[in-house]
């Protein structure tokens, strides 16, 4: 029985794969590829919260959200009114029934308490994005509620 002929010897392709993997690991490319396969989650930092006695059951909350490159939010909603201001990078937002918008530093976006946020992501695969959100929301309810 004759061996199967290929355009490249099998031994060479294995060698190339092994050397390529070692080089990628040495230079951190493997971790960058892993980050691309599963985007990192957004980092949310609470800046300030305050009960709103004039609005019973409501509180004001200010947060920053940092999207790593390629970060994507799951579909969700928020229990209040959100006023978004982009600080750096570029983000893409859309609520159900609305148009997808790309926002850059200095631009704003609004989400209402009945909106389902169907798109929330970093527009870049290589640069981070950061925005601040001021919420007027139901007191004691998480600001992020996963939904379908």
Label the predicted regions:
Residues 100, 114-141:
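Ligand-binding loop in jelly-roll beta-barrel domains
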Residues 2-61, 128, 142-148:
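A short, N-terminal "cap"/entry segment at the start of jelly-roll beta-barrel domains
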Residues 67, 97-114:
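Short acidic-glycine-tyrosine-enriched beta hairpin
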Residues 58, 70-85:
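A short beta-loop-beta micro-motif enriched in histidine and acidic residues
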Residues 50, 69, 92, 108, ...:
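Extracytoplasmic low-complexity repetitive segments enriched in small/polar residues
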């Amino acid at each position: 029985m004759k061996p199967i002929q290929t355009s490249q010897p099998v031994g060479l392709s294995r060698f190339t794969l092994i050397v390529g993997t070692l080089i990628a690991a040495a230079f951190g490319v493997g971790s960058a590829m892993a980050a691309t396969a599963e985007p990192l989650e957004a980092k949310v930092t609470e800046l300030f919260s305050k009960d709103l006695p004039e609005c019973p059951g409501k509180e004001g909350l200010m947060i920053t959200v940092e999207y790593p490159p390629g970060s994507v939010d799951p579909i969700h909603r928020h229990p209040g009114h959100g006023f978004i201001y982009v600080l750096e990078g570029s983000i893409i937002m859309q609520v159900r029934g609305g148009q997808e918008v790309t926002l850059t530093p200095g631009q704003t976006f609004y989400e209402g308490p009945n909106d389902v946020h169907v798109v929330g992501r970093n527009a870049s695969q290589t640069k981070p994005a950061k925005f601040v959100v001021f919420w007027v929301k139901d007191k004691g309810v998480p600001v992020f509620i996963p939904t379908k």
